[in-house]
């Protein structure tokens, strides 16, 4: 099976990157052709709440990680979606954590799945559907994103409950040991 993960990975640091990389390793260990498309720009520097977005560790060996996504450039989203469409993955897996990523991820997903020959399925792993400090724009952005996916995996029951408002097919995630 050909699986493309869209989201945070090396050289970015943190739990999102670690999760995506570990998931990719698991898919590879099961014999799947797996690649991660990560960011050239995840957040503009002035929006990043921490000291740095980047890790100083080596890139994970034996993982294909391509830095291609600019989260704030709509022209890049179109190019990235077209590139994914040409790759014809069986599954495009997106890790979603913030509605600010909805325009980027939603546009890429819609373009990528237009490939009828591959019949790419877009599956999302939701950490959060709506942030704790929610606003009306969060619901609009999340609706845009969820209308472009085929199914979802949620990380908690409360996230699954939040997602029901968007009429998405949900499967709960299994417990993952560290």
Language-model features and meaning:
Residues 7-21, 44-45, 97-102, 133:
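A short, glycine/small-residue-rich beta-strand->loop->alpha-helix junction that serves as a flexible
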Residues 8, 95-98, 126-129, 172-178:
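Histidine-centered beta-alpha loop that forms part of the nucleotide-sugar donor binding/catalytic region
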Residues 10-13, 25-84, 159:
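N-terminal strand-loop element at the rim of the active site
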Residues 42, 159, 170-178:
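Short beta-strand->alpha-helix junction loop in the catalytic core
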Residues 66-70, 79-104, 120-125:
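Short N-terminal targeting/anchoring amphipathic segment
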Residues 121-123, 128-148:
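Nucleotide-sugar donor phosphate/pyrophosphate-binding loop at the beta->alpha transition
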Residues 147-170:
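A short, active-site helix/loop in glycosyltransferases that binds the activated sugar's phosphate group
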């Amino acid at each position: 099976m050909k699986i493309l993960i869209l989201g945070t990975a090396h050289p970015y640091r943190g739990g999102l990157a670690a999760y995506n990389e570990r998931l990719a390793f698991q898919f590879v260990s099961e014999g799947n052709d797996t690649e991660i498309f990560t960011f050239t720009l995840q957040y503009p520097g002035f929006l990043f709440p921490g000291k740095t977005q980047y890790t100083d560790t080596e890139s994970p060996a034996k993982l294909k990680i391509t830095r291609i996504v600019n989260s704030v450039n709509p022209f890049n989203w179109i190019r990235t979606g077209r590139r994914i469409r040409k790759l014809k993955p069986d599954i495009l897996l997106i890790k979603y954590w913030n509605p600010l990523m909805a325009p980027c991820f939603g546009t890429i997903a819609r373009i990528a799945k237009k490939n009828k020959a591959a019949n790419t399925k877009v599956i999302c792993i939701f950490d959060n559907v709506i942030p704790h400090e929610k606003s009306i724009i969060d619901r609009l952005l999340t609706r845009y994103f969820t209308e472009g996916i085929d199914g979802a995996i949620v990380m908690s029951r409360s996230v699954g409950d939040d997602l029901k408002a968007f009429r998405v097919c949900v499967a709960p995630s299994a417990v993952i040991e560290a």
